[in-house]
């Protein structure tokens, strides 16, 4: 084999290996919603979105410091005890991992396409064990709340990360098949995003939010921001 052809083949093989280790292409939307019922006041509504939300911007130096100042996932507001479904086929990786937050209970499922899903603020410890196989649409948990009393903040916190390392977070709206624009119209949480007045169009759409690297540099430290009342 000619040396040039040999190098080309080797480069192609290396690229194939690297690409094979990456999560599935973003435009495939391989996952489904983690809830069984249609949205509505008696079932569930969209809560805080993923990314550069106004609330995350306000809490960028505290609650969301580890997420580069952004909200790690998307919240589904629902009464405590609402069934939570696996968004795709996979294997249970962790149950009640303190490392990944979203307490009092959480669950991580590694999916075959290189992604992992984290289900947080669960009502009780999921009745699953690491290594157990689960199917898309299977009930895996119940919604709870971070305050432990289910008085007013019942919701599911859902994250999509890189399987195995869990250091990279992705926008669920780019990976879950759903009409996100319609869902955002009736949610219980405002869908505003913080605005950098020096680049006011950046990160202003549900599906236009950036990936997050855990403990990476802050992405939303703006000299001038909107809304002004949230600045520090």
Per-region residue spans from a language model:
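Conserved beta-strand positions that form and line the central face of beta-propeller blades
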Residues: 75, 108, 118, 142, ...
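Solvent-exposed loop/turn segments at secondary-structure junctions
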Residues: 81-83, 97-100, 114-116, 124-125, ...
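Surface-exposed, glycine-biased beta-strand/turn segments
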Residues: 16-105, 136, 185-232
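Conserved, short, structured surface segments that act as functional micro-motifs
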Residues: 111, 132-202
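Zn2+-dependent peptidoglycan hydrolase active-site motif and core
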Residues: 87-126, 130, 153-157
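Short amphipathic beta-strand/extended segments with alternating polar/hydrophobic composition
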Residues: 47-49, 54-58, 119-122, 167-179
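N-terminal Sec-pathway targeting helices
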Residues: 1-11
């Amino acid at each position: 084999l000619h040396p040039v052809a040999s190098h080309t083949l080797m480069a192609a093989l290396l690229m194939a290996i690297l690409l094979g280790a990456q999560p599935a292409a973003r435009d495939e939307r391989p996952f489904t919603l983690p809830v069984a019922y249609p949205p509505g006041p008696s079932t569930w509504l969209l809560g805080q979105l993923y990314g550069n939300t106004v609330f995350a911007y306000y809490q960028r130096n505290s609650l969301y410091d580890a997420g580069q100042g952004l909200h790690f996932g998307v919240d589904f507001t629902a009464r405590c005890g609402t069934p939570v479904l696996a968004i795709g086929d996979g294997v249970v990786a962790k149950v009640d991992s303190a490392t990944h937050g979203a307490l009092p209970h959480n669950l991580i499922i590694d999916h075959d396409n290189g992604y992992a899903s984290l289900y947080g603020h669960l009502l009780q410890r999921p009745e699953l064990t690491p290594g157990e196989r689960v199917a898309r649409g299977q009930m895996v948990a119940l919604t709870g709340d971070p305050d432990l009393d289910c008085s007013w903040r019942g919701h599911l916190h859902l994250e999509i990360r890189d399987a195995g390392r869990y250091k990279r977070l992705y926008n669920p709206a780019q990976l879950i098949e759903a009409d996100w624009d319609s869902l955002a119209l009736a949610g219980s949480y405002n869908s505003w995003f913080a605005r950098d007045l020096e680049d006011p169009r950046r990160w202003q759409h549900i599906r236009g939010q950036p990936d997050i690297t855990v403990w990476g540099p802050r992405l939303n430290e703006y000299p001038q921001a909107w809304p002004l009342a949230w600045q520090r």
